[in-house]
Amino acid sequence: MVTAGKPDELALAEYRQIKAEQVARINTRDNLVYVTLVAIAGALTITHSAHSRGYLLLVPVVTWVLGWTYLANDHMITAIGRYVREHPGLPGMRWETDHPADRRRRSRKTIQLAVDLVTFCGSGLAALTAFWLADPQPPLLVLASVAEAIATGVLAWQFIAYARGRAS
């Protein structure tokens, strides 16, 4: 039962819980960038050590899986922020509305989109290009590389579509 004074306590408890989830997701999302870079370095090391360009096909798979995870976390981070902005439970909590109104937000989001595309899509496409320019490869690997290129294109499209929806 809610009594006088209790709604503010409930709103504060909800806010703390939601913000804790958002912070956890931000940490996960940020760490995914580092994990991706390490995974790319590992795949390139294996490719170089094995003297086989076929291992380059690991890069798009890794960046695709981690990119989707990154995008899903980013979506939830944005959804939490939107919820807190649109359902203000406590007076005086202006950060959630003031921060997104920053006039440089659009340029920051554009730069972030470019970084995301290079990290999660460009690196995979670079590996695929190196694979395609190598000596002739078995048809099954070529077919796999085409599927990876399509999947990477879909991921890039999702990053762009999502950025357009949230940058406004």
At which residue positions do the language-model features occur?
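Inner-leaflet juxtamembrane helices
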Residues: 54, 59-105, 156-168
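Hydrophobic alpha-helical transmembrane segments
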Residues: 49-60, 135-149
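Hydrophobic, membrane-inserted alpha-helices
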Residues: 37-44, 61-63, 122-130
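Hydrophobic core of alpha-helical transmembrane segments in multi-pass integral membrane proteins
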Residues: 117-132, 142-160
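Cytosolic-side membrane-entry/anchor segment at the start of a transmembrane helix
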Residues: 1-43, 159-168
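Membrane-helix exit/interface motif
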Residues: 41-48, 66-72
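Loop-to-transmembrane boundary segments
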Residues: 26, 97-124
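Transmembrane helix-loop junctions in multipass membrane proteins, especially transporters and channels
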Residues: 50, 131-139, 160-167
